[in-house]
UniProtKB/Swiss-Prot annotation:
Keywords: ATP-binding, DNA replication, DNA-binding, Nucleotide-binding. It comes from the Archaea. Belongs to the CDC6/cdc18 family. InterPro entries: AAA+_ATPase, ATPase_AAA_core, Cdc6_C, Cdc6_lid, ORC1/CDC6, Orc1/Cdc6_arc, P-loop_NTPase, WH-like_DNA-bd_sf. Involved in regulation of DNA replication. May play essential roles in origin recognition and cell cycle control of replication. Binds specifically to the oriC region, which alters the topological structure of the DNA and introduces localized melting of the DNA duplex. May recruit the MCM helicase onto the oriC region. Shows weak ATPase activity in the absence of DNA. This is ORC1-type DNA replication protein. ATP binds at residues 73-77, 221, 233. The gene is cdc6. The keyword Nucleotide-binding applies.
Amino acid sequence: MNEGEHQIKLDELFEKLLRARKIFKNKDVLRHSYTPKDLPHRHEQIETLAQILVPVLRGETPSNIFVYGKTGTGKTVTVKFVTEELKRISEKYNIPVDVIYINCEIVDTHYRVLANIVNYFKDETGIEVPMVGWPTDEVYAKLKQVIDMKERFVIIVLDEIDKLVKKSGDEVLYSLTRINTELKRAKVSVIGISNDLKFKEYLDPRVLSSLSEEEVVFPPYDANQLRDILTQRAEEAFYPGVLDEGVIPLCAALAAREHGDARKALDLLRVAGEIAEREGASKVTEKHVWKAQEKIEQDMMEEVIKTLPLQSKVLLYAIVLLDENGDLPANTGDVYAVYRELCEYIDLEPLTQRRISDLINELDMLGIINAKVVSKGRYGRTKEIRLNVTSYKIRNVLRYDYSIQPLLTISLKSEQRRLI
């Protein structure tokens, strides 16, 4: 095909895509970052948060709040909704309120949390702290200085606070929950949000009592509640008549199976719409929802593999090689033998077989492999290890990992299972 024919084909493709019926009116409405004007089935939590924060409008310091519930139960969106409303109403009463939102999955050290708070005020103060390099005490001193420049209320929202505490300890929480004793003008309140209630076990009792002055629990949504949420968002997200009748109930039912996760429900609806749009379909159907479910699961599995520790990646690659050699199901001993050779090849200290057995269990729990214990009669019990993800997909993810790349050209000799 010459260049002119390529151009004609591409022209035709663009024309066809332009003529296709538009599916989305505003796709952003289905994203996690969107804060809607109303939050169905969270009015009780909204009211509780408002009651705790209303002292701000009277010029009094509100309590610190600990918010918890599973993923996708509306914690973050509800806290953002209430604090944004508080900020808006405070302007009417001429009360300065600053709300600083920090995602602790990204900002996960004591230093960086403090630096982010200081830098929030940089346009006002002209003071900016680099993300590394200063003594932490100096950053904390700057934080007190910038916050206390005038009378104001500062609400610090620490989302995924458990990630911060598990990685860096609770020192930053100790500082922030006691900062009011060191301020003359400003008043600070902390809202901690967590998916993991057990993380409180990691906290010093003094920090826990300060942070948990008030607690707000978010229970999972049921399928009917998820349906209401999706119906509300769909009205803004899609053009009229593009959703088949069964699409929203199916998205709600699939997400309800996973502890009532509204994020999962919104992702399913958005991805189903994207697939329908790419196919040039005039409607989003249940078939598109099932395709969306498959795509989301694949994407999640890729992310899980990508974030595995190096030893687990080498172990997984040993299982891939056995699979490509036709040697699955394999037992732990077979896998360990290949794993040891791979470690030798990249000069990595191998773990013990007992530890590798633990890592096999972890890969099994993550759903990447299946490690079923089977009885061999008088020979005892053994694990039969199989892949749940294709070798091709695993290779595709691992090829971007520089520490694993030297192994990707290796294969096994059929009989001896030796590396070649």
